[in-house]
Swiss-Prot record:
Gene: rps11
Entry protein name: Small ribosomal subunit protein uS17
GO-annotated cellular components: cytosolic small ribosomal subunit
Sequence intervals crossing the membrane: none
Top-level taxonomic group: Eukaryota
Organism in which the protein naturally occurs: Xenopus laevis
Length: 158
């Protein structure tokens, strides 16, 4: 519990009561606090780290106060330089009627990445779900991570 207290405010899950009095039980050692977690539905499994972990994240869809509703999208991770937020790239085709052809286009999206998803790398494919606005630019939450396959055939810079 001491390793998660790195912020100025005391980090705790708001739905868990931590001041239980254990006078007559004769407790031995340090007991683990109960943990609040839930299923977001829509066929997405709750990660094991969300159930067993000790992180505190109020914007996590599995342990926080965020509901997933609206669109379900997918994209490729391009940047991981923010704290608990990643940038994903969504590629799509746009039809040009004059030339009867398609052109490639893309959009970048800022997405909240919960600490329950470890080992996320640039190039992984993520499935995101829409939620309420979490910040100025973040409106989606990561629900599932699919590891990038071995990219031997694609061109790599280095």
């Amino acid at each position: 519990m001491a390793d998660i207290q790195t912020e100025r405010a005391y980090q705790k899950q708001p739905t868990i009561f931590q001041n239980k009095k254990r006078v007559l039980e004769g407790e031995t050692g340090k007991e683990k606090l109960p943990r609040y977690y839930r299923s977001v539905g829509l066929g997405f499994k709750t990660p094991r780290e969300a159930i067993d972990g000790t992180y505190i994240d109020k914007k996590c869809p599995f342990t926080g106060n965020v509901s997933i509703r609206g669109r379900i999208l997918s994209g490729v991770v391009t940047k991981m330089k923010m704290q608990r937020t990643i940038v994903i790239r969504r590629d799509y085709l746009h039809y040009i009627r004059k030339y009867n052809r398609f052109e490639k286009r893309h959009k970048n999206m800022s997405v909240h990445l919960s600490p329950c998803f470890r080992d996320v790398q640039v190039g992984d494919t993520v499935t995101v779900g829409e939620c309420r606005p979490l910040s100025k630019t973040v409106r989606f939450n990561v629900l599932k991570v699919t590891k990038a396959a071995g990219t031997k055939k694609q061109f790599q810079k280095f």
